[in-house]
Amino acid sequence: MNVGVAHSEVNPNTRVMNSRGIWLAYIILVGLLHVVLLSIPFFSIPVVWTLTNVIHNLVMYVFLHTVKGTPFETPDQGKARLLTHWEQMDYGLQFTSSRKFLSISPIVLYLLASFYTKYDAAHFLINTASLLSVLLPKLPQFHGVRLFGINKY
């Protein structure tokens, strides 16, 4: 074990989702969020599933698609300061296993939420809007695109 030795990555954001156990931790955190929401007595099952989906997608959108730069003092801060975490992930390569996992997980959660809400129209619209808001920025066509100048700087 090398104590005090710096990591070899110039920008740790590029490889964080490929770390050991990160996918399992992600799934456990989503499950924990769902259990915490289930423990609130006045929420029905459909409301809990919709809230789990919406909170998950909101957190994913904020952390992957709005926060830019790196949380570390890195030599490449000049390059990474204008890129979101999603754009930095896997050095910008598309269709890597981490990107596929983070694209499929909201879809799976959406399908579960739709099933457990029994396809109720109000829940369905909320869950669909939430899914689209988090899936569209992940498309390769939106890499580096800032709609209406939002989050440009």
Swiss-Prot record:
It is a multi-pass membrane protein. The gene is ORMDL2. The chain crosses the membrane at residues 22-42, 43-63, 106-126. GO terms for cellular component: endoplasmic reticulum; endoplasmic reticulum membrane; serine palmitoyltransferase complex. PANTHER family: ORMDL PROTEINS. Residues 1-21, 64-105 are cytoplasmic. It comes from Bos taurus. This is ORM1-like protein 2. Belongs to the ORM family. GO terms for biological process: ceramide metabolic process; intracellular sphingolipid homeostasis; negative regulation of ceramide biosynthetic process; sphingolipid biosynthetic process. The keyword Protein biosynthesis does not apply. Plays an essential role in the homeostatic regulation of sphingolipid de novo biosynthesis by modulating the activity of the serine palmitoyltransferase (SPT) in response to ceramide levels. When complexed to SPT, the binding of ceramides to its N-terminus stabilizes a conformation that block SPT substrate entry, hence preventing SPT catalytic activity. Through this mechanism, maintains ceramide levels at sufficient concentrations for the production of complex sphingolipids, but which prevents the accumulation of ceramides to levels that trigger apoptosis. Ceramides bind to ORMDL3 N-terminus and stabilize it in a conformation that physically restricts the accessibility of the substrates to their binding sites in the serine palmitoyltransferase (SPT) complex, hence inhibiting SPT catalytic activity. In the absence of ceramides, the N-terminus is flexible and permits substrate binding, thus liberating SPT from inhibition. InterPro entries: ORMDL.
